[in-house]
């Protein structure tokens, strides 16, 4: 009887999740602007329920799109009719999700210390929040946990503060997981937190950084969305706020900042994955950071971490105008990418958002740069498309390790070039 009950509970949990059986991810290659526009027509056909992992940008830039099983034939016919090339990147999305769940289940078990915590698996929101508490308890002189707000659904929004003392010192901000389905980012954030406590006092270069600068690390920037990726829809990107007059849920928190808000590269359609919201900072998850940054007033570097595509980006995204500090930002990016690549040979591109990928309005680092935070950067971590958002857990630690080398480069530059 008990065995049957447990099986029923497990089955109920599985059945509650959105199913992606037969969904494929296509990689579309566009040769000219006319083909880009044709793919944008596809993007507007809501009945197909397409999920663009990498949207149409410009000729030569790959487009990745998850296509639900019922829409596959129609999409392929459309592409072939217009001479647009494509390959199948992921044959069946659900197979990767099943592998991910099996790996997580096999790695379950509550860690009592940060040394026994498993950094090579994906964790739930509760497990990450537990990890934060353990880390603070182990290093009370170095780490504290701040609540900077509450999410739309009432979850606490936490930031870890790493500091060796002093009031309102110059600071570095790092956030991960603003797009909830980008699981390798939150997992990397957890690894960064542990790395900071390990390297302080051991690595002279990092010790110098933390002796002079505070570090604020927001590991789960979109807690509602992240919880939803675990409970119901692994592919959820946005927040979970409700928009009056629409059945569609959520806002893209990386289109909700007051920097070119509502311009090209964001959508006014609440059902779009890039819906910008009704007004700037409408999302409490964004407003909490805005208020924190403004109240602090001394943040010198701001780094927002996404996946995937293997990019290091700096402003601007909403306009073609180059930032005043373009040459310096470009040189830092070049050095950071070289450091990252030195570990495993992972290749990254770098440049401004609008010239490297596409125009995007209302983005995080455009706002921070406009607020006077000169060293504003955004990462897109592994990979370049084999797995996309479903990066195997075996790549978490290598991804975090190589990214840390790039972060160190940015942090050292920030320390050595005060402004």
Swiss-Prot record:
Zn(2+) binds at residues 179, 182, 306. Residues 17-110 form a propeptide. The keyword Protease applies. Substrate binds at residues 179-182, 237, 254-255, 307-308, 358. Its cofactor is Zn(2+). Coiled coil: none annotated. The keyword Protease applies. Binds 1 zinc ion per subunit. It is found in: Secreted. The active site is at residue 380. PROSITE patterns: CARBOXYPEPT_ZN_1, CARBOXYPEPT_ZN_2, PEPTIDASE_M14. Its EC number is 3.4.17.1. It comes from the Eukaryota. One of its GO terms (biological process) is leukotriene metabolic process. Monomer. May form a complex with proelastase 2. This is Carboxypeptidase A1. It comes from Sus scrofa. The lineage of its organism: Eukaryota, Metazoa, Chordata, Craniata, Vertebrata.
């Amino acid at each position: 009887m008990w065995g049957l009950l447990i099986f029923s509970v497990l089955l109920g949990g599985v059945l509650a999740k959105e199913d992606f059986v037969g969904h494929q991810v296509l990689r579309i290659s566009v040769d000219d602007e006319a083909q880009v526009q044709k793919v944008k027509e596809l993007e507007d056909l809501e009945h197909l329920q397409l999920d663009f992992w990498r949207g149409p940008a410009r000729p030569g830039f790959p487009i990745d799109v998850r296509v639900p099983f019922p829409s596959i034939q129609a999409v392929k016919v459309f592409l072939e009719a217009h001479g647009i090339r494509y390959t199948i990147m992921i044959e069946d999305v659900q197979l990767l999700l099943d592998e991910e769940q099996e790996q997580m289940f096999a790695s379950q078990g509550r860690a009592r210390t940060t040394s026994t915590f498993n950094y090579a698996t994906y964790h739930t929101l509760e497990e990450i929040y537990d990890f934060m508490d353990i880390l603070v308890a182990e290093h009370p002189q170095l780490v504290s946990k701040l609540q900077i707000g509450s999410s739309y659904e009432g979850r606490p929004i936490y930031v870890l503060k790493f500091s060796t003392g002093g009031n309102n010192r110059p600071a570095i901000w790092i956030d991960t997981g603003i797009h909830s389905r980008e699981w390798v980012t939150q997992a990397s954030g957890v690894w960064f937190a542990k790395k900071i406590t390990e390297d302080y006092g051991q690595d002279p270069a990092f010790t110098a950084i933390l002796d002079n600068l505070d570090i604020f690390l927001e590991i789960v920037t979109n807690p509602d969305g992240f919880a939803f990726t675990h409970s119901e829809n692994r592919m959820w990107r946005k927040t979970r706020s409700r928009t009056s007059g629409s059945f569609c849920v959520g806002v893209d928190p990386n289109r909700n900042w007051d920097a070119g808000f509502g311009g090209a590269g964001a959508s006014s359609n609440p059902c779009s994955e890039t819906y910008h919201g009704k007004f700037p900072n409408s999302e409490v998850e964004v407003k909490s950071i805005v208020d924190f940054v403004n109240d602090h007033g001394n943040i010198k570097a701001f780094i927002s971490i996404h996946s995937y595509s293997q990019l290091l980006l700096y402003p601007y995204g909403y306009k073609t105008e180059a930032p005043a500090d373009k040459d310096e930002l470009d040189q830092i990016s070049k050095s950071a990418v070289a450091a990252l690549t030195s570990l495993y040979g992972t290749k990254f591109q770098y440049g401004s958002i609008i010239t490297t990928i596409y125009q995007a309005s209302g983005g995080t680092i455009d706002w921070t740069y406009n607020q006077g935070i000169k060293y504003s950067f955004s990462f897109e971590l592994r990979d370049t498309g084999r797995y996309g958002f479903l990066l195997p857990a075996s790549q978490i630690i290598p991804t975090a390790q190589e990214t840390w080398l790039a972060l160190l480069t940015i942090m050292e530059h920030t320390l050595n070039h005060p402004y």
